Amino acid sequence: MKEYIIAQNQNIMRYHDFPGKETPILFIHGLGCAGSFDYPEVAAQAELVGHRRILIDLLGSGFSDKPDDFSYTVKDHVDYLYGFVYELNLQSFIIFAHSLGGPIGIELAKRCGDQVTALVLSESNLDPSSV
């Protein structure tokens, strides 16, 4: 797995980055899940293999750090993910977001604007303010 060091707090978010020449897909998992555990089989599907596939473990999940002093709000997740997108130089990408990842994906898409070419939500809470 790769590591992204979050500038604001020096915590480490871990992720898989599978190569592909088509539009990158950023997978944002839900509560009780982790990209490293729940999405490798999905990312291996023939229909997706041409895409660059980025499977993250949000802070507090999977192999990423689990800091006690992090608030775990949608906004705080979006803050470091926006930096992550910038660090990876994702000029154009797709967001796939599940469950709690949904409001995170919605807010990240708002912040990234035209960089996000599609937003796919699965079993998502559509109101970020309610999380």
Where are these regions (language model features)?
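N-terminal cap/lid segment of alpha/beta-hydrolase-fold proteins
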Residues: 1-12
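Short, well-ordered coil/turn elements that cap or connect secondary structure elements
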Residues: 10, 48-50, 90, 113-114
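Conserved HGGG/HGGXW glycine-rich cap/lid loop of the alpha/beta-hydrolase fold
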Residues: 11, 17-63
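Conserved catalytic-core motifs of eukaryotic protein kinase domains, centered on the activation segment
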Residues: 37-39, 64-70, 130
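Short, hydrophobic alpha-helix immediately C-terminal to the catalytic nucleophile
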Residues: 40, 82, 106-110
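Active-site loop/oxyanion-hole signature of alpha/beta-hydrolase fold enzymes
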Residues: 55-96
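Conserved hydrolase catalytic core segment
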Residues: 91-130
